[in-house]
Structure formats: structure tokens, C-alpha cells
């Protein structure tokens, strides 16, 4: 429900996208919806919300095993997987390590990550979700620091928080969200 309709923003590395499903994903899945022998922008335009939902459930939730994580973590990790692929798992694994878990940061969810997430969740409670959401926000800032074209996703045209930052902060408690002044200070070097 979060993802919007068709967009083909040249600054978005995902390329043509509809309901959050990128042309790259559709090509990987062989979704030639117009049956013309290739997967192109026309196929992206034909994607239905129901098809997108099925893709997300199968390939973004079940296949990477996000459904095996503690229930409190599933929404934020799933949302980030839709937005950033396996980088979301690396962020999670790094956060778990910050809580003392001894796991490999490899971008793959497996028994070590599941057990570490369960143990840390039991100890840290809601703070694990907050810590993950903060790390996610920092990931977006770091992307925008390195790639000027990505800044419009972190900062809107009026200079306030952009979609990426709002998206990350939706999953954290209010006390961990940046104030407008903190946000302005963080992005001030972007000019």
C-alpha cells in the first residue's frame, strides 16, 4: 500500500518502477506482461497492484526469509528490503553486532542472524527497531552524501525531509526522529 504508481525517474537507479517493483526485478523474474518477447517499460506500466503484492510477498518477504525474524522487526526490515534490497540485511546484521551479536555481515538471513535477532530483540525490546531505523536513516544520508543525484530522495524541494528520511523515521519512536533544525544541520553541507 505504501508504494505509488508508475514512475521513471532518471535519478532513481531502480529505473522504471510501478507500485515499488522495478524494471530490473521484472526482468529478473521474466515478467513479459505484454508478451512481446522482452521486458521493458511497457511491461512495467501493465503491472497490477495485485501482481506487485504477490512479487513483494514471495520475493521480498518470504524468499529472503524476513518472515523468520522476530515479529517486531519484520515490518521495518521488509520495507527497507523493498527499498534497498539485501543492503537491508547488512544493516540489520551490523546493528545486531553493535548489540554484541557475533555474526557475519554478509547480507544473507540465515540461522545465525535469526538467533541473534531473537536474542537481541528479547534484551533490547523496542530499541532494536529504533536502532535499525536510525541505521537505515544514516544509510540514506550516506548515499546522498556520496551521490548528488540521490539527495532529492533525502531532502525535498522545499529543503525539508525527503521521502527516504520520512520512510526511515516512520518506524522509530518520536524521540529518535530528527527535528527540522537537526535535519538542516545534517544536510547543510549539501549546498
What positions do the PLM features span?
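Cell-wall polysaccharide-cleaving catalytic domain and substrate-binding groove, primarily
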Residues: 1-191
